[in-house]
């Protein structure tokens, strides 16, 4: 899903807190 990929990239760039269930939810930023 393109929307999920965009969210994951944005969250990966922030790296504020650990990412849980990265594949399922994207992240908890």
UniProtKB/Swiss-Prot annotation:
This is Phospholipase A2 acanmyotoxin-1. The keyword Disulfide bond applies. Expressed by the venom gland. Belongs to the phospholipase A2 family. Group I subfamily. It is an enzyme of class 3 (hydrolase). It comes from the Eukaryota. Its main location: secreted. Keywords: Calcium, Disulfide bond, Hydrolase, Lipid degradation, Lipid metabolism, Metal-binding, Myotoxin, Secreted, Toxin. Its EC number is 3.1.1.4. InterPro entries: PLipase_A2_dom_sf (IPR036444). Snake venom phospholipase A2 (PLA2) that has myotoxic activity but no significant neurotoxicity. PLA2 catalyzes the calcium-dependent hydrolysis of the 2-acyl groups in 3-sn-phosphoglycerides. It catalyses: a 1,2-diacyl-sn-glycero-3-phosphocholine + H2O = a 1-acyl-sn-glycero-3-phosphocholine + a fatty acid + H(+). One of its GO terms (biological process) is phospholipid metabolic process. Ca(2+) binds at residue 28. GO terms for molecular function: metal ion binding; phospholipase A2 activity; toxin activity. Contains 7 disulfide bonds. Its cofactor is Ca(2+). GO terms for cellular component: extracellular region. It is found in: Secreted. Binds 1 Ca(2+) ion. The keyword Secreted applies.
């Amino acid at each position: 899903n393109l929307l999920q990929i965009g969210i994951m990239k944005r969250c990966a760039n922030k790296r504020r807190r650990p990412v849980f269930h990265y594949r399922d939810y994207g992240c908890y930023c």
